Amino acid sequence: MTRSKSTTETTRAARQARIVAILSSAQVRSQSELAALLADEGIEVTQATLSRDLEELGAVKLRGADGGVGVYMVPEDGSPVRGVSGGTARLSRLLSELLVSADASANLAVLRTPPGAADYLASAIDRAALPYVVGTIAGDDTVFVAARDPMTGAELADTLEKLT
């Protein structure tokens, strides 16, 4: 006996690909909001399945710099690799959402983020392949960004703030 799939039934991979696409393009604040967006595309999903999908994708809910309601984000795995176009656009978006403050010392820009968001911001900086950045180190809520000579840390902090 052959089972035919209805329009609301999708493979796990296809469903997860849509979840990544939605989370990359919209600020989703809850699982019910995500389920509604999927339903709009004809993908019906239970809360338990959605929760499992988010966990498998490594999605996390992060608060923005304004401290407001958190939004879901997925890791960089599907994002542009270092130096590929699109990395700077993503960096600008993340800076505007996550940058709380910027300071500097010598050749370092010190960026503050909400708790748990520093690694996402550091990864976006690395992947943007900015010619004036040597590299990053991220903690929980702080990113050290090393400026390439002759740029100073203060100039780098100012440049990154202007990308928001």
From Swiss-Prot:
Gene3D superfamilies: 3.30.1360.40, Winged helix-like DNA-binding domain superfamily/Winged helix DNA-binding domain (1.10.10.10)
One example of a Gene Ontology biological process annotation: regulation of arginine biosynthetic process
Single Gene Ontology MF annotation: DNA-binding transcription factor activity
Domain of life: Bacteria
Pfam families: Arg_repressor, Arg_repressor_C
Location of the protein in the cell: Cytoplasm
InterPro entries the record matches: Arg_repress, Arg_repress_C, Arg_repress_C_sf, Arg_repress_DNA-bd, WH-like_DNA-bd_sf, WH_DNA-bd_sf
SUPFAM superfamilies listed in its UniProt record: C-terminal domain of arginine repressor, Winged helix' DNA-binding domain
Keyword Repressor among UniProt keywords: yes
Record key words, sorted: Amino-acid biosynthesis, Arginine biosynthesis, Cytoplasm, DNA-binding, Repressor, Transcription, Transcription regulation
Role description: Regulates arginine biosynthesis genes.
NCBIfam families noted in UniProt: argR_whole, PRK03341.1
Similarity comment: Belongs to the ArgR family.
Protein known as: Arginine repressor
